[in-house]
Amino acid sequence: MKMKMFPALERRYGKEHMSALEAQRLAHEISFGPIVFQVSRLMVKFGILQMLIDSKDGLTMDEVVEKTGLSNYAVKVMLEASLTIGTVLYENDKFTASKAGWFLQNDPLVRVDMDFNHDVNYLGWFNLEEALVNGTPEGLKVFGSWPTIYEGLSQLPEQVQKSWFGFDHYYSDNSFNEALEIVFNNNTKTLLDVGGNTGRFAMRCVSFNKDVNVTIMDLPQQLEMMRKQTAGKEGADRIHGHGANLLDENVPFPTDFDAIWMSQFLDCF
């Protein structure tokens, strides 16, 4: 099995570019990765990074304590950790946000990734070793006993669903405009959307082309969520469902469509 990479990636990952000290620091950062992640997440959640960004001259530790209502100890732990993480700076007894801290707070992609990893993945990662050895999603048991997460999406806690779909939609929605031009370049009238999820792409299709009929092939649970999301919207009458488990090799694949679209290509791969 070979891995193919674009030339730019080959240049970046084909040779060593770090000095020994840089490599050693990275190794230490990796060893404390979970702490780096959680402290940084809480710096955003508690509003501390935003306070530092909004403050022209920075804030003292006592001022952060006063503004957040957190204990001296809690603020001290987070600010000192953030200093070594690289998201805050310290000068003349005052803390300010670094460039990395600014992006941590303001980059929407960072927020989507952080929510996804904390709410959806974090607890399950503890079972990664079992998952790799057994070839099964062992970490999924923190939420339920389904064969894959897709059977249980509709039953996940509300915040977990929000972060899952937030991640899914952010990575896919930004590609819809270009994708629609390609899909309908050949006068497509019937489209099979494999793994259409909540029907966002299907809704864009029926809005883009007033004649197309879209059939979403997905798990029955997903189709139920799709119907709730599209109910009452213009063009929803041209969106149909075909319930099937794509992992079951015995399930026949629908035919006689002008085009077949896989939404997963926009965010999963």
What are these model-derived regions, one by one?
Residues 249-260:
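A short acidic, Gly/Pro-enriched loop at the edge of an enzyme's catalytic core
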Residues 187-197:
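Conserved class I S-adenosyl-L-methionine
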Residues 262-265:
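A short beta-strand submotif of the Rossmann-like class I SAM-dependent methyltransferase core
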Residues 198-210:
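Conserved SAM-binding loop of SAM-dependent methyltransferases across substrates and taxa
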Residues 235-247:
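Conserved SAM-binding strand-loop segment of SAM-dependent methyltransferases
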Residues 213-218:
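Conserved SAM-binding motif I beta-strand of class I
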Residues 9-54, 66-189:
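Conserved Class I S-adenosyl-L-methionine-dependent methyltransferase catalytic core
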